[in-house]
A protein has these predicted regions:
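Short secondary-structure boundary segments
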Residues: 451
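Short, compositionally biased terminal leader/tail segments enriched in small/polar residues
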Residues: 4-5, 29
Length: 532
């Protein structure tokens, strides 16, 4: 039996930071005196690991005791990077999170730095998977509440904004001009006016054109928008009559207005009349107490470092479990960053049918890569590597920590709205803007974005930036909303998860995140094919 086949059969739940297989506390180690322990030194994540992770820079010559191992560090180990706990021979598996993250390219001495210079991926082509279901011990917990906007169709938004949605990139400049003019309508219960520009809607074929139309329709129905102006040109492929007939379906004609620019003499004058009507309609909504079971939260990471899978991502995973225990919904995406850890998700699928859909989710993305003559493991990024992530397996095993321990209840195609409460998997790439947009399009009212490097981007919905380390949180305070780096200093995962849950309730009740305060709003549609 190959390692890939053996990995597909193994039944292992995602690790919990600070716990081993027996659910006993696994210490984060410090070599300082009692008064110097506000910054810990290293962590061995799983009892089977032959590497540990530095939680602060470790100097050459430092002597460390890691469980049964006595290690003298041979060279400087940057924060978030790995060092060997025992000699690792060339060709031997390097184990982290209890799983193989690659093979040693050369002999590595105990205490040696383990990174891209001496570690290579073990990922290859498509695999065959066997369903070995793992039961979840997640239980219901007490109700929680936030103040949201109940829409006429029963759905709940966490913002009451007016959205201008172009059907085609040709009218982007008009949409942006209208956004500026319509800011005068902001006030009272109208929280903002936002134009979501994009370059698509014409000169597209096949799946690309279909995806654009689905995304536009989903955005029109998103509950964070109290009013929507759909702005068309008139000659585009994704024109307003086609969208109405085949994609949008039923809509509230007080909430959604349409304008085709080629049909009127002065499109800005006519658009402002419609926007004023939308402002009156949206202004009639007010926040009301809503059960947290109505929340749909997207989960994404980017600019990850070696601490992302130890602090920020497990915190989000624990948050996900907490929200789901209260009847809420979370969505996990960025499929290419599941490669190498996919069986942890597959075996948590509630039914064989969901398992089969998850297999297709993974293999369809692998086929997408190979159809473009690209390798499936062309990841991590330069920033990931600088932060301590060495291979895609290393990245994926950390990335999937965001899923927590809940069973998989749904598997969504790109631009497919979420229908089932609980944990859902969504088909979308790893690209930050494209994936975050995909989460919003599928119904997320808020996106949680973990990062070890930092990024200012936004998405169509409030995007909470969660740092994996305290240095980033201090250095880029204008970007970071929540610091999970304190897990290696003075807080537990459960404590941070509860704090994050409380913060999300505050955001859902109107608190602006840093990107919103800066006025940032982005939308990026997934492009796969040719442009005419």
């Amino acid at each position: 039996m190959t390692y890939e086949q053996r990995l597909c059969r193994i039944i292992v739940s995602p690790y919990n930071i600070g716990q081993n297989r027996k659910n006993e506390q696994l210490p984060i180690h410090s070599t300082g005196t009692e008064g110097e322990k506000d910054m810990q030194d290293f962590i061995r994540i799983h009892e089977d690991d032959n590497v540990a992770v530095a939680l602060r820079p470790i100097a050459p010559g430092e002597n460390l005791t890691v469980g049964q191992y006595q290690v003298t560090v041979g060279e400087e180990i940057p924060q978030g990077h790995k060092f060997a706990l025992k000699p690792i021979a060339k060709g031997e598996e390097v184990i982290k999170y209890g799983f193989r993250i690659g093979y040693a390219k050369e002999d590595v001495a105990a205490g040696g730095w383990v990174h891209v210079h001496n570690l290579k991926t073990a990922l290859g082509d498509l695999l065959e998977y066997q369903y070995e279901p793992v039961a979840s011990g997640l239980k219901e917990s007490a109700h929680a509440y936030f103040d949201g906007y109940r829409r006429a169709d029963g759905r709940v938004g966490v913002r009451n904004e007016i959205w201008i949605i172009p059907t085609v990139g040709c009218v982007n400049s008009i949409a942006q001009a209208l956004e500026k003019k319509a800011k005068k309508f902001v006030g009272g219960n109208v929280e903002d006016v936002i134009a979501f520009t994009h370059p698509y809607g014409c000169s597209q074929m096949g799946d690309d054109q279909e995806n654009t139309r689905k995304v536009l329709a989903d955005m029109i129905h998103h509950p964070n928008a109290g009013g929507v102006l759909v702005l068309g040109l008139g000659c585009e492929n994704s024109n307003i009559p086609l969208l109405k007939e085949q994609y949008i379906g039923e809509y509230d004609d007080q909430r959604v207005k349409f304008l085709q620019c080629q049909d009127v003499e002065d499109e800005q004058e006519e658009a402002m009349k419609l926007l004023e009507e939308l402002a009156v309609y949206a202004g009639a909504f007010s926040r009301e107490t809503v059960d947290a079971s109505e929340l749909v939260i997207g989960m994404k990471c980017g600019g990850s470092d070696g601490l992302s899978g130890i602090t920020a991502n497990p915190t989000v995973g624990a948050f996900s479990d907490l929200l789901i225990s209260k009847g809420g919904t979370t969505i996990l995406t960025e499929v290419p960053e599941m490669f190498g850890a996919e069986t942890l998700l597959m075996n948590r699928c509630e039914t064989p049918e969901l398992f089969d859909k998850t297999v297709h989710l993974i293999n369809d993305f692998k086929n997408y890569f190979t159809s473009h003559n690209q390798t499936i493991y062309e990841n991590p990024s330069p920033g990931n590597k600088k932060g301590g992530i060495s291979t895609l397996e290393d990245k994926s095993l950390g990335c999937t920590q965001k899923s927590g321990s809940a069973p998989v209840k749904g598997v969504l195609a790109y631009a497919e709205p979420v229908k089932v409460k609980g944990l859902n998997l969504l088909s979308a790439p790893g690209n930050d803007l494209v994936a975050a947009t995909a989460l919003a399009v599928s119904g997320a009212q808020i996106v949680l974005f973990t990062t070890g490097r930092g990024t200012p981007f936004a998405s169509p919905v409030p995007t909470v930036k969660i740092s994996s380390n305290s240095k980033l949180a201090g250095h880029k305070n204008n970007w970071i909303d929540f610091n999970a780096g304190s897990m290696v200093e003075d807080k537990s995962k459960d404590q941070l998860a509860q704090e994050l849950f409380d913060y999300v309730l505050a955001v859902a009740s109107g608190k602006k995140v840093k990107a919103e305060e800066a006025g940032f709003h982005d939308m990026a549609i997934f492009k796969q094919g040719v442009t005419l």
